[in-house]
Amino acid sequence: MIFPGLAFAARATGEENALSQSTQPLLQPRGVAEMLDSLVASDGTGAHPHVRAGALSSGAQAMRNLAHAVHFLCLLHGRHPGVIDNAARKAVDPASRQWMDEAADAFVQERAFLSKIASAVGPVPSTQGQAQCEAAVAAQRKAIDMLAESDRHGCAVGAAIALTLDWRTIRVLLDISAQRLDMTP
């Protein structure tokens, strides 16, 4: 049985045997950490075609691509207060509040590093469709802010957790940028 609610629904409708005789393989139960890692891998920064193809770390356009990525990351996450700061204000549970405060303190250094790289990489390269890209990033920033400022139970802390999990990949991109710019992380 995968989900208790599914078993209840099957008993209520008399379909319990039909569910157990399904030709589809049963999903293996996974832990929360595995599910979150899977979501980050499939939908996070690392899933972007430029990241998967290595377009940010090698090739003739790598530095240009990195400059775009760094500037857009700075637009998304370089402001204060950011996702984690806003979510920390919403946290009422003592355990999540402590984690949020620690994460917000740590993110101060990450934001400073991001700003330092954005400054070192120079201006945003001029590209056809740049205005549309900036508008899309501004819309993403607004959506991220809405999640981080939400009063819905778990929404703000979920946004902070998602950013923290995805930051592992983002930090790799920042480290690659720092290396290419001869900066020390």
Language-model regions: role of each:
Residues 95-185:
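Active-site-proximal alpha-helical scaffolds that flank and shape metal-associated catalytic sites
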Residues 22, 31-38, 50-51, 65, ...:
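Exposed alpha-helical structural elements
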Residues 3-53, 131-136:
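Acidic, low-complexity proline/glycine-rich segments
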Residues 1, 51, 56, 61, ...:
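Generic low-polarity alpha-helical segments
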Residues 18-31, 55-67, 150-154, 182-185:
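Short, charged, low-complexity loops and linkers
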Residues 40-46, 56-91, 109, 150, ...:
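Alpha-helical bundle segments that constitute or directly flank the non-heme di-iron/ferroxidase center
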